[in-house]
UniProtKB/Swiss-Prot annotation:
GO terms for molecular function: histidinol dehydrogenase activity; NAD binding; zinc ion binding. The active site is at E328, H329. PROSITE patterns: HISOL_DEHYDROGENASE. It comes from Rhodospirillum rubrum (strain ATCC 11170 / ATH 1.1.1 / DSM 467 / LMG 4362 / NCIMB 8255 / S1). Belongs to the histidinol dehydrogenase family. Pathway: Amino-acid biosynthesis; L-histidine biosynthesis; L-histidine from 5-phospho-alpha-D-ribose 1-diphosphate: step 9/9. The gene is hisD. GO terms for biological process: L-histidine biosynthetic process. HAMAP family: HisD (MF_01024). Binds 1 zinc ion per subunit. Keywords: Amino-acid biosynthesis, Histidine biosynthesis, Metal-binding, NAD, Oxidoreductase, Zinc. This is Histidinol dehydrogenase. The lineage of its organism: Bacteria, Pseudomonadati, Pseudomonadota, Alphaproteobacteria, Rhodospirillales.
């Protein structure tokens, strides 16, 4: 049974706070193991990758065999039925078009003192994409991570994916080819992150690493941050649905289960102002769990982390609760979703109206599905083009403009006790240190 809360009850505040404070991430401490793997790969390079691949993926491979050949990729693509290939192509097209609109513009102007000022954006040179392996790997995540990098102008995009016992979902390779991935390597885990960060004889290092992974991959990304950039440390998936009683309860039940089926640690929350509707949704979830293929996972998620919150008025009460949850996915299944969305500050992605299930955003809508979890939407955003770019500011002074602003720079340098700073300005104004 999910947690049931009523905003009007006397104990709501502490109960809601406990819901927010509930820890869903793995408590597994893997930092020492990961540190050893990173150090080993940094020291032994390809030999370490080969050893770990044999140990963890039960697969013997040579250094030359770490990289997928073009023929292997083409063979995998040929295995995919045309309708599925077309669906993947449509997703890639829509994702690309949306992210093209995220491209920033340069700034260039001359201010009132005659100083030229500006800002330009450039892409990182190389990015690495981690893809969880096996037959259950998600090609949609390949598109969502790779296409923004390509739109940004990343010159070299590298994908690493473990292949347990040599198995890989051919859709993953097809998505990589469609997205323009330049190199694909059959290596995973913390050792793959190490290879991307430090480089080996076979795998040249990258500048930024993105993509989801298990506790070992997450710990590895944390530890190599600073040597390379990373996107985020993703936690279990989550959805918050704000729905009125005019909805089909089965639709809302399926939306809640769309995240619950990801992981037993995922969280699905419903906020509604209709008690009878809440009851119908709960019954619909129970009915659907009887037939869902991933029922064991979804049932554990709904039982341990699910919640239904009853409020007096959705427009008045829901936004404050939403902002405290700061959900990864927010569905607004109400008559006027825009009015409600305008009052929400913290959410990774917002899905507007009764006909916009979160799952449409996972695959085909266009915006990225790599989103902040675990309340980090309070201060961070989903993956996008800017994650693969950096800005550089530009300053240009002539003799006259330096004369206009230089004296103040000299005074500030003197106040900070940095003599050479001030002299470097004063010398250009034919002045000494005063």
């Amino acid at each position: 049974m999910p947690l049931r809360l009523e905003a009007s009850s006397a104990d709501f505040a502490p109960a809601f706070a406990a819901l927010l404070a509930g820890k869903r991430e793995s408590a597994q401490d893997v930092n020492d193991v990961v540190s050893a793997i990173l150090a080993d790969v940094r020291l032994r390079g390809d030999d370490a990758l080969i050893d770990y691949t044999a140990r963890f993926d039960k697969m013997t491979v040579s250094a030359e065999g770490l990289r997928f050949s073009d023929d292997e990729v083409d063979t995998a693509v040929a295995l995919i039925e045309p309708a599925l290939r077309d669906a993947l192509a449509l997703a890639a097209k829509r994702i690309t078009r949306f992210h093209e609109r995220q491209m920033p513009t340069a700034i260039s102007f001359t201010d009132e003192d005659g100083v030229r000022l500006g800002q330009r954006w450039t892409a990182v040179s190389a990015a690495g994409l981690y893809v969880p392996g096996g037959l259950a790997a998600y090609p949609s995540s390949v598109l969502m991570n790779a296409l923004p990098a390509k739109v940004a102008g990343v010159e070299r995009l590298v994908m690493v994916v473990p292949t347990p016992a040599g198995r890989i979902n051919p859709l993953v390779l097809a998505a990589a080819k469609l997205a323009g991935v330049d190199e694909i390597y059959r290596v995973g885990g913390a050792q793959a992150v190490a290879a991307l960060a430090y480089g080996t004889r076979t795998i040249a290092p990258v500048d930024k690493i993105v993509g989801p992974g298990n506790a070992y991959v997450a710990a590895a990304k944390r530890q190599v941050f600073g040597t390379v950039g990373i996107d985020m440390i993703a936690g279990p998936s989550e959805i918050l649905v704000v729905a009125d009683g005019a909805n089909d309860p089965d639709w809302i039940a399926l939306d809640l289960l769309s995240q619950a089926e990801h992981d037993a640690a995922a969280q699905s929350i419903l906020i509604t102002d209709d008690r009878a509707f809440a009851d119908r949704v709960e019954r619909a979830v129970t009915d659907r769990l009887r037939t869902l293929s991933r029922t064991e996972i979804a049932s554990a998620s709904w039982r341990d982390h699910g919640a239904i919150i009853l409020v007096g008025d959705l427009l008045r009460d829901a936004p404050a609760l939403v902002d405290k949850v700061a959900p990864e996915h927010l569905e607004l299944a109400v008559a006027d979703p825009d009015a409600l969305a305008a009052r929400v500050r913290h959410a990774g992605a917002i899905f507007l109206g009764r006909y916009t299930p979160e799952a449409i955003g996972d695959y085909i809508a266009g915006p990225n599905h790599v989103l902040p979890t675990s309340r980090t939407a309070r201060f961070s955003s989903g993956l996008g083009v800017l994650d693969f770019m950096k800005r550089t500011t530009l300053v240009g002074c002539g003799a006259e403009s330096l004369g206009a602003i230089g004296p103040s720079a000299v005074r500030l340098a003197r106040a900070e006790g940095l003599e050479a700073h001030g002299l470097s300005v004063a010398a250009r104004m034919n002045r000494g240190w005063e």
